[in-house]
A protein has these predicted regions:
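Class I SAM-dependent methyltransferase SAM/SAH-binding core
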Residues: 46, 52-94
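A short acidic, Gly/Pro-enriched loop at the edge of an enzyme's catalytic core
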Residues: 93-104
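Conserved class I S-adenosyl-L-methionine
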Residues: 1-41
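Acceptor-substrate binding/catalytic loop of class I
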Residues: 145-160, 183-185
Length: 206
């Protein structure tokens, strides 16, 4: 495990209660509904970096089957307490997805991965999708990369997102949506959302 990942996980382990409280009121319904509309009824979802389990719970209530994982043991416990799901404790690099999935939801999670590692990690998970499966990713908007307040952040703008997805074999970018933060009092913060899908016959450039 690299130092950036270790420090980021330690941050969440030490601040889990505060993080859960800060994100519980996030109004994610619109993004969740958009993602759900891309999936078959009752389909399988991987909540990649599930955090508090807030989104996993919403998808369970909507009738989907959900696998959840997170790198922080404290966040895994919080997600299990909220959802009753068996939440896998593993890093993005170590976790072995139990696909095939109809969709992968990576909300505000892969932004903690250094950019040099992102194509390989995203490619690993894209390969666990069914053909036509949806892959949602969100990042803080911008070009900053590095440690900030105890966590690693890899921010993305439109150009960086297009380049990232283009370097993942089989993944096709359908839309980039720039949105305001949905947490109470955080509307001034901006997010870049990538809506993509996996097609086994798509080939990206290297």
């Amino acid at each position: 495990m690299d130092e950036a990942t270790r420090e980021t996980i330690s941050y969440y382990d030490e601040n889990a209660k505060r993080f859960v409280a800060d994100t519980a009121g996030a109004r994610m319904g619109e993004l969740q509904s958009k993602f759900a509309s891309m999936l078959p009824t009752g389909g399988r979802i991987l909540d990649l970096g599930c955090g508090s389990g807030r989104d996993s719970l919403a998808f369970l209530k909507a009738g989907f089957k959900v696998d959840a994982m997170d790198g922080s043991a404290a966040m895994c416990r919080a997600a299990h307490a909220l959802t009753s799901l068996p939440v896998a404790h593993a890093t993005f690099e170590d976790y072995e997805p139990q696909g095939p999935y109809d969709g992968i939801w990576a909300c505000s999670s892969l932004l903690h991965v250094p950019s040099a590692k992102l194509p390989a990690i995203i490619g690993k998970y894209a390969g666990a999708l069914k053909s036509g499966g949806a892959f949602y990713l969100s990042f803080k908007y911008g070009t900053f990369e590095g440690m900030r307040h105890g966590r690693w952040f890899t921010n993305m703008d439109e150009e960086l997102l297009r380049s990232l997805v283009a370097h993942v074999e089989g993944l096709r970018l359908n839309e980039i949506e720039v949105t305001a933060d949905v947490r109470p009092g955080r509307a001034g913060e901006i997010w870049a959302n990538a809506w993509s899908e996996f097609e086994s016959d798509v080939r990206s450039y290297s």
